[in-house]
Amino acid sequence: SEIRTKGRKSEVKYQKIKNVEKPLSKIIFGCAIPVMIQGEDADELLDEVYAQGITTFDTAENYGLSEASLGHWLKNRGNREKVVIISKGCHPYDGRDRVTPENLKHDIEQSFERLGTDYIDIYLMHRDDPKVEPGPMVEILNEYHKAGRIGAFGGSNWTHQRIAEANQYAGEHGLIPFTVSSPNFGLCDQIGDPWGGGPGCVTISGPSNAEARAWYRDNQIPVLAYSSLGRGMFAGIVKSDDIEGAKKILDPNAVKGYCYPENFERLARAEQLAKEKDCTVPQIALAWILNQDFEVFPLVSAKKASRIASNAKALDIVLAKEEVEWLD
């Protein structure tokens, strides 16, 4: 069910998903930004984001002090019951995979402490380790769900095949399955692994991942799409005719993941359509995500709330099926 409320600048839309009591804002604010990673006071920025109607915030155990920064805001504003919190655990450290029951419990408990909350609306396993049976992790996530400590749960950077494996275990043991997933997805295809090391990042972007997208559509599992603007490549700061300039502007991870000819061609098409529709490139890129035939919530980060306000206008852009196909 979709709910709409008038935001200050644009009409923000909200969507209910399974096992989460509150509706999610269709655009999610990503808290892996310098001010929050460093644990500084981000209250003013978060106030402005919230004022735009964005009520869903994505953080993680390994985003430095991001959880503590978000928790500081929640405590000061007393608005925990009005927002949806997504957090993640089991990220590898120093090349050591951490997809184990012990690490999962440790990271969940640490997130509660840092966030200053006794429950997390959506909990994700940040990375996967395909050598590990998913069953024990499914058991632990169910324990926390049953205790009312986490709502929906799933994987970030888990392939759809591994999610299916986890859900088969859940089905065979009368347990709740993964009902949400957070891979990379966007018009900017993640061709390289931005971070590398260990079990890699999972994307469902680009022509080679049509099967994965069909699986999400058929299984009706919502996607929380990280790096939805290609870590800045489709944020309006890079021009399609200046590849060398892009490599200077974007961070090394973005260059490694996204700076490929195919994406500059997509960027040129997005620039053209943005001009025709009198809007911005990031608005077109986000509208492309929001106009897909499966349920997807783009994650967007920004150091300034004005950029988030501008990006939120993507919610008002309707793209024809032909435009969606042409952009890609």
Over which residues does each language-model region extend?
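N-terminal binding-site loop/beta-alpha segment at the start of enzyme catalytic domains
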Residues: I3-V84, K146
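Active-site mouth loops of central-metabolism enzymes
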Residues: G30-E40, G89-N103, K131
